[in-house]
Structures are given as C-alpha cells and as structure tokens.
Regions:
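Juxtamembrane intracellular "pre-TM" segments in multi-pass secondary transporters
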Residues: 5-13, 197-227
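Structural signature of the two symmetry-related core transmembrane helices
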Residues: 85-99, 180, 289-304
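Helix-breaking motifs and short loop linkers at transmembrane-helix boundaries and internal kinks
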Residues: 50, 82, 103-109, 120, ...
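Conserved MFS/SLC helix-loop-helix module at the cytosolic interface between two early adjacent transmembrane helices
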Residues: 68-108
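Extracytoplasmic
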Residues: 18-50, 241-246
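Cytoplasmic helix-loop-helix junction between adjacent transmembrane helices
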Residues: 113-154
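Helix-loop-helix hairpin linking two adjacent transmembrane segments in secondary transporters
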Residues: 109, 138-139, 143-192, 198
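Extracellular/periplasmic helix-loop-helix junction of adjacent transmembrane segments
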Residues: 40-69
Length: 408
C-alpha cells in the first residue's frame, strides 16, 4: 500500500492498520454524537421538565446547525493552516461544547453546548477527508476509505446501545463525559503519531473574497444546488426518523430498554445498501441508481403511509420495521451518489466547494427535520409523510438537474 502512497508530510505516514483505526474513530465522532443521545431523550425531558417532549429533537438539530457554520469555516481553514491544525482545533471546540452541555442547568444551555459541539466536530469531519486525500491516491485511497466507511457504518448500529449502557449506570450527563474522554484520547494519539500532510508551500491564504466568490458560483449553479438540496432533504428525513424514533418505539410499541437493538437493525440497512452501491454504481451509474432509489423510497413511504392510515397511525411492529428498513436502504444508496454528483461539477474549487455544499445540505436538513418533527403526534403518519415529501422533492430536483446537464 505504501507504494501507492502520495506523501506530502515530512514524516513517514502511519501503517495502514493504525491509520485506518485512527481515522475510523475520528470520522465516527459525528454519528456517535448523534445516535448515542437517543436513549437519553426521556431522561433529558424529565431532567429539564420539558412541557413538550418533542423539544428533545432539538438535541440532534442544534448539533447539525452548528455543523452548518463549522463546515463552512474548517474547509478553507484546513487549506490555510494545515489539516492537523483544523482537526485539533475542531476537537478542542468539540470538547468545550461537551463540558458546557454536561454541566448545563437549563435545556437552552445544553443546546448551546450541542451547537458548539456541532461546530467543532466539523473540523475532524472536513479536514480528515483532505488529510486522507493528501496521503493516498487511486486504488490505495479507495481501499482506505472503504475500510473507514465500514467502521463508520457500524457506529449508528452500536451508538444507541452505548448510550443506553451509560444511562443504565449513570446520569445522561455522563454521555458527554464519554464524548470528552474519547475525543481527548483520540487527540493525544493523533498529535503524537500523525504528521502534517499539507506542507507550508502548498497552503492557500484564507480569503473571505475567495469564499464569497465560490459561494456565489455554487449557490447560483442550479445543477450543484439541486444535488445539495436533495442530499439535505434526505438527511433531514433521516434526522426526522432519528429524532422521533425513540418516541415512536416508546409511545406506540412500548419498547424502551431494547430500543437500541431495534434501531441497530434498521441502521444496518444503510450499511447493506452502501456496500451494494459500491458494487452497482460502476455498472449502472450514479444517476440511474439514485433515481431508482428515490422512486423506491417514494414507493415504500407511500406504503408506510397507507399502512399507518389503515391502523390509526399505529401499524404493527413488523410492518413498521420492514418498511423503515427498506427506506434506510434507499437512503444509504443516495447519500454517496448525490454528494459525488454535486462534486463532479465543482472543478477548480472542489476543496472550498465541498465545504459550501456540505454546509448548504446541513442547513436544509436542519430546517426540514425541525419543521417536520413538530408534527409528531404519537403516530407514524408524520414520519411517512416526511419520507414521501423527501422522495418527491428528490425525484423532481435530480431529474431537473440531469435534464439541465444534458442541455448544456
């Protein structure tokens, strides 16, 4: 693997096993920060005496809102100050957010901590991708990323169980203590073992003008924005599910203690479909796969809506699990393809453009999930409608983007 390595660092890169292990942990921070909190929702609502339990969804939304701004800053910052600087700065900010959230005496105070966490975790999320790209190219990079993604896919499956384990023996605040301990440990390991990969002669001065120029180019480019908005809406639908899943399982199916196991089963759909997408995309292409997945998502969402309406909004656990699993499979296919299709047209502003696309998608996802989440009424109907709307908008936007590309 070292033969295909493209080294820009002054020190030799880590061995493949250590490198994969380190960056699998770094990239897992986002998913861990979201999914580990789900079992704690009832305890958080009780601790802060929330009048409306739907407000616990904001624990997820505010984290993603913080990422909206973080993704916009850390991309250019990693090109200016280096990958290592951006990753470590992001981890420090994330740890500050953990401390604030852990010690918050009000729900609003905890949400401020979560927003800071989201801003900070954008550093490792964005800069780690650039660092991997610095050190590996071609088949070697594809192999490294596939191993990292395998681990990343497992995190949503085990994170709720981890959160459940912590609150079984301690306060929900200790989940933030776990985040803090884990991040500090990774930061120490990363600082000692990983060299900077962006040498000073290759760094680009931080420029508000450049960010503004790139933003205008992307925001007024219909094709790029169509893919970015679609990705945001679909992530918003996923956040809608994540934000309401604990309540659905508790309110409708009286499942509390074993909720993490059911959530893990559903999350495995993303892993299965991501694996299949890697096999199928070279044969059928991103557009065909994406449109097929969107149409399938619309079909399954319609089925969930019909089943829900026929059962007063409370379908049997079997039907809910089956249809939700199939929806997760569709979303797993869509995420990677939509991002790749947006990146295809970025050209010479790919680095900065990736940050703007990610930030735009995150903003759309927050707006979608917060609005849709307020309609939760102890039935699965709002969830079905949310997925159906996401699929409908996605089909229209992706089809329109491809038509525009064909006419260019």
């Amino acid at each position: 693997m070292n033969n295909t390595n493209n080294k820009t660092a002054s020190k030799p890169c880590l061995g493949p096993i250590e490198f994969i292990s380190m960056f699998a942990l770094i990239t897992s921070l986002v998913a861990l920060s979201i999914d580990s909190m789900l079992p704690a929702f009832p305890a958080i609502a009780q601790s802060f005496a929330l009048a409306d339990t739907k407000d616990t969804q904001l624990v997820i939304s505010t984290l993603v809102l913080g990422m909206v701004f973080g993704e916009l800053i850390f991309g250019p910052l990693s090109d200016t100050k280096g990958r290592k600087y951006a990753i470590l700065l992001g981890m420090v900010i994330f740890c500050i957010g953990c401390v604030i959230a852990m010690n918050a005496q009000t729900f609003e105070g905890m949400l401020i901590g979560r927003a800071i966490q989201g801003f900070g975790v954008s550093g490792p999320k964005i800069a780690s991708r650039a660092l991997i790209r610095d050190q590996y190219t071609g088949a070697a990079m594809a192999r490294i990323m596939s191993f990292i993604m395998m681990f990343f896919i497992l995190v949503p499956m085990i994170a709720p169980s981890l959160g459940q384990l912590i609150i079984t023996f301690a306060s929900w605040r200790m989940i933030f203590a776990f985040f803090l301990l884990m991040t500090v440990s990774i930061a120490i390991w990363f600082t000692i073992r990983q060299a900077e990969t962006l040498t000073k002669d290759k760094r680009i001065p931080f420029s508000i003008k450049a960010i503004s120029k790139a933003s205008k180019k992307i925001l007024f480019e219909p094709v790029i924005m169509a893919y970015a908005i679609t990705a945001g809406i679909l992530f918003g639908a996923l956040l809608l599910f994540i934000g309401t899943a604990q309540a659905i399982f508790q309110d409708i199916y009286a499942i509390v203690e074993h909720f993490p196991l059911y959530f893990a089963a559903l999350a495995s759909g993303v892993g299965v479909s991501s694996f299949l997408n890697g096999k199928l995309v070279m044969r059928y292409g991103m557009y065909k796969l994406s449109m097929s997945a969107l149409i399938a998502l619309g079909t399954f969402s319609s089925l969930l809506f019909i089943v829900s309406m026929l059962s007063d909004g409370q379908p049997s656990l079997f039907w809910f699990m089956l249809i939700s699993f199939l929806c997760f499979c569709c979303i797993g296919i869509l995420f990677g393809n939509l991002t790749a299709m947006a990146m295809e047209t970025l050209g010479d502003i790919a680095g900065l453009g990736a940050s703007i696309v990610a930030s735009s998608s995150s903003l759309v996802s927050v707006v979608f999930s917060v609005i849709a989440g307020r309609f939760y009424n102890q039935t699965t109907i709002p969830l079905a409608v949310g997925f159906l709307c996401a699929a409908g908008f996605g089909i229209y936007l992706v089809y329109s983007a491809e038509q525009r590309k064909a006419s260019m």
